[in-house]
């Protein structure tokens, strides 16, 4: 009997969908403003200069605009019965800037309605948040309903957690290419929704090559490190390793850069990259384009400022060392199925991806509308330029169909109301992105590190076996923290950070 009291107390504090609700609350309170702060604003081509910068965003409780123009609060049950969306309006502070250069003048800020945000039942901005069982009954809800889902066009939609490989961590593996074994160190470098796969490969002939987005083909590691500021052979070796066995593996790479490519300085290396990314262009443009590629596409999680190139060079050295050690046998392959090498994208993270994409489309539309006003010799008006349907419809369409940003399908699903257990099971489901038609024996197997995190028995039969999983009943999922805040805290308490 006492154990029952303890279990009840635990689930009063930690509901079965707490992971999704916490993630969504974090999205509303922090991530939306973060996405808006990432954007510099709206830059137009209007003669005389006209820009718009963004301020604070405001999200209210769910409301509905009636046919007669009146606005009133909407409850989840009303949204179900009337086939409406349970969503909250978004208001964004916009600051117009008129003129160019020193003559630029800042006008007073305007708060503009930019669209509707789908609201998760049970979240802080939901009318049901913190309500007692009696209040839930008055709202027409089942007091035992787990919540944690959305209502779109009257249909209940559950957003299913997606399993992904860990971002921003070096993983080592051996891969067979052309009947030969290649030793690879790779990292899924992720920053503000942009995911770049950067790899350092050690080929069977001992040469190290790097691949990353923005480069049409692989580039020798030594050339790339020279472009990032490590000019001398000694400097490159020191950045990789001081172990004699590892250093011996670098000799062929240093000779290749000097003898085959004739690259001895940072400028030579930048020009070599420039020839690949901007062929046939003047030298100055090539150098500038090469630096832009290195800043924006090489290891973007470390920063996109030119001051971060030295840190990126150190990081590449670490990746090169790992791939050489993997070849020498002093390092083992990373286990991709180890749960420390996995991360879950919960409702808030998936909504963040969707909102970022929808908001960028809204910015493009605002720019187009402002420029069209100028062509028609009208005074630019922000209120007239913002078409709230752009953001609203993109988000609602994704929620209704399950077709998400990045080509993912089945992210949102119709809530299974077959039974209470079926509903809870769906809200605690975890889906792997791996293809159902491939064997993937290791990925489907039960891994020892899933103990206490993933239910060992609840997985479907057939092609989804082992790829569709469920969280263990007392599993907790923490929300992600931004690296910048952690690094700042480390500095404040007096610790140093080399990279």
Swiss-Prot record:
SUPFAM superfamilies: beta and beta-prime subunits of DNA dependent RNA-polymerase
Single Gene Ontology MF annotation: ribonucleoside binding
Keywords per UniProt: Cytoplasm, DNA-binding, DNA-directed RNA polymerase, Nucleotidyltransferase, Transcription, Transferase
Catalytic activity: RNA(n) + a ribonucleoside 5'-triphosphate = RNA(n+1) + diphosphate
InterPro entries hit by this protein: DNA-dir_RNA_pol_su2, RNA_pol_bsu_protrusion, RNA_pol_Rpb2_2, RNA_pol_Rpb2_2_sf, RNA_pol_Rpb2_3
Any GO CC annotation of this UniProt entry: cytoplasm
Family: Belongs to the RNA polymerase beta chain family.
Assembly behavior: Part of the RNA polymerase complex.
NCBIfam families linked: PRK09606.1
Function: DNA-dependent RNA polymerase (RNAP) catalyzes the transcription of DNA into RNA using the four ribonucleoside triphosphates as substrates. The Rpo2 subunit (Rpo2N and Rpo2C in this organism) is implicated in DNA promoter recognition and in nucleotide binding.
Protein name: DNA-directed RNA polymerase subunit Rpo2N
Organism: Methanococcus vannielii (strain ATCC 35089 / DSM 1224 / JCM 13029 / OCM 148 / SB)
Lineage: Archaea, Methanobacteriati, Methanobacteriota, Methanomada group, Methanococci
